[in-house]
């Protein structure tokens, strides 16, 4: 088994120096230019004391600066702890303390008493020091730590090794194929594993990336039509935004793949994509699996509507209930295994032992496999609403709500109920005139009685994280305050 590999970006710059690596707005950077920038950043970081094996927090927005910092830390042999720019100061301080970082590199205004904070601009204006650049990467070494969104309890730092990132990129290429003219539009934040994984694919495949600094549906819509984009990663909300802008039109046939993640997609949305010939590949993955671990190819978009597909070539997947593997169509916990799966959480041995057993990761997600082995993700176990002993999946109710023409967005959570234990409550963003009664009546026609929300509340917008995933915990707080 391969233990080490040549430094990825350095090798890529050697193999295809003049090929475009990154496009951002009107700027183009080749792989050799990117390598040179990274060496320079690495020398500046060496001057401020960054050494091999240390953990360095990165709080930056999508841009060439953030890309160079992430690569520079790998050149130095340090571990990048990627922080979510949308978190509060308290949450960020907690994560930095938990990860035992030696400093923070940021492009934002941030003050911390106990941790040295270096602004990227200051570091780059300061002196350089000769750096000892890692010529090889050990696949067993940690490359990044990314905190889980903490949908349950305190966030946990997921350790991803060079080997995890390599396996993820290889698995994806065996699944989607590679083409010389590939260009991946990157609009996911790079502090999330979905965004970060594109940086890995960029240097491993030698593939051009069109980087969008912040989510801008108008720019992305136009770029898909004019910039030669072949692949884009999206979540349902982004796809809905793009379809609105597309209207009666279509995207060029060169767009060969829309990789859709971030939870089960509403059927009406997928049906619209089929009508328009947009190749949507539904995926399932998480921080712990270094991004996707399952993908449904566009061939099955309609015959397997709602499925997340089958595992990547080097991955395995099964459904367990109470530690026993269950037959097709039986619901249970999704359990996965593969070289892209994390070895554990930083300083959380209990959580690691609980989650990973004999190399199998217990995801905390509920789903089932059909008779052909296609995965259907039902919901997060923690999002499950149990009403009078019946399991209710919020995603199913949301799908019904989203099929109403006057509903733009929908989120469903459990609400405490004296009689049933829990009942569903819906939060809706309107796209036209509609009343609570009309919404509930609409649900009554399409859902079992016990699944119909007991109330529907209107919001201007739903709470979402930086990758546009619905934050149900914030909806739960709203329910508690009612």
Swiss-Prot record:
One of its GO terms (biological process) is menaquinone biosynthetic process. InterPro entries: AMP-bd_C (IPR025110), AMP-bd_C_sf (IPR045851), AMP-binding_CS (IPR020845), AMP-dep_synth/lig_dom (IPR000873), ANL_N_sf (IPR042099), ATP-dep_AMP-bd_enzyme (IPR050237), MenE (IPR010192). It is an enzyme of class 6 (ligase). Gene3D superfamilies: 3.30.300.30, N-terminal domain of ligase-like. Keywords: ATP-binding, Ligase, Menaquinone biosynthesis, Nucleotide-binding. It comes from the Bacteria. Pathway: Quinol/quinone metabolism; 1,4-dihydroxy-2-naphthoate biosynthesis; 1,4-dihydroxy-2-naphthoate from chorismate: step 5/7; Quinol/quinone metabolism; menaquinone biosynthesis. It catalyses: 2-succinylbenzoate + ATP + CoA = 2-succinylbenzoyl-CoA + AMP + diphosphate. Converts 2-succinylbenzoate (OSB) to 2-succinylbenzoyl-CoA (OSB-CoA). PANTHER family: LONG-CHAIN-FATTY-ACID--COA LIGASE, NONRIBOSOMAL PEPTIDE SYNTHASE PES1 (EUROFUNG)-RELATED. This is 2-succinylbenzoate--CoA ligase. The gene is menE.
